[in-house]
Amino acid sequence: MKIRKLFALVLALTAITAVAFAEFDTSKTIAVVSREEGSGTRGAFIELTGIATKDADGKEVDNTYIEADFVNGTSLVITTVSQNDAAIGYASLSSVLHNDTVKMVKIDGVEASTENILNNTYPIARPFNIVTNGELTNELAKDFMAFIMSKEGQAVVAEDGLVPVANDETPSYTASGLKGVVVVGGSTSVAPVMEKLGEAYAALNPEVEVDVQATGSSAGVAGALDGTYMIGMASRALKSSETDGGAVGTVIGLDGIAVIVNPANSIEDLSVEQVKKIFTGEVTVWADANK
């Protein structure tokens, strides 16, 4: 009786192992997951991968696959990919660096990491910007910006997985003792590190609250210009139309854009060109992804 039970247990474990290590079905249709229009991550991604082109008038054309699943926000991209073994998406490196619900794909043989962004070998990287409508006049907002760009603020940026812009001449921060609320709004990718910066700043200035609103990069720039936000957030370089309108960007750190798939997917490496073909709909089946 015991032998039969043991044999049954061995068979069950063998079956489980076989399922766990079953080869991914590459005949599956690729489920492309993209960010919504106005997303700074999307804007940077389509530019860096060649998905965006120029028309005859020199205007940018976004050639993202029309059948893609367009979702709002970084967390929803991650959730969508984690729940579909045929899905592929992209997200801020800092948001997936320690997330095992999705798998980061190498790009041109290079892993997405802060080290590879710093040494310029990872090809899909972009700046994180804070945005104002010119020179700040609000003392509290100015002080918070000073903290972000200080040694202490840049340490928070580094701890969040970004490449900081600090150097040997970066000043230390001295608590100001100011009171009030700083309203910051924009990129959903920048928002997590901004929340941590706000917490660190408030710890030094207990009577200050930093209100971070994640609304998207374009909304962040527009909000900084029209006064909705004291400080905007953009997870991309500012457009000429935005700077012409008075927007001023300050880079607080560099972030990679990780291409992510479901952990069940056997794909490990894609070239930038292959990524482009997938996200424009030229390649629609996983079996053709590495061709």
State where each predicted segment sits.
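Exported/periplasmic ABC-transporter solute-binding proteins
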Residues: 21-291
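Sec-dependent N-terminal signal peptides of Gram-positive bacterial secreted proteins and lipoproteins
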Residues: 2-22
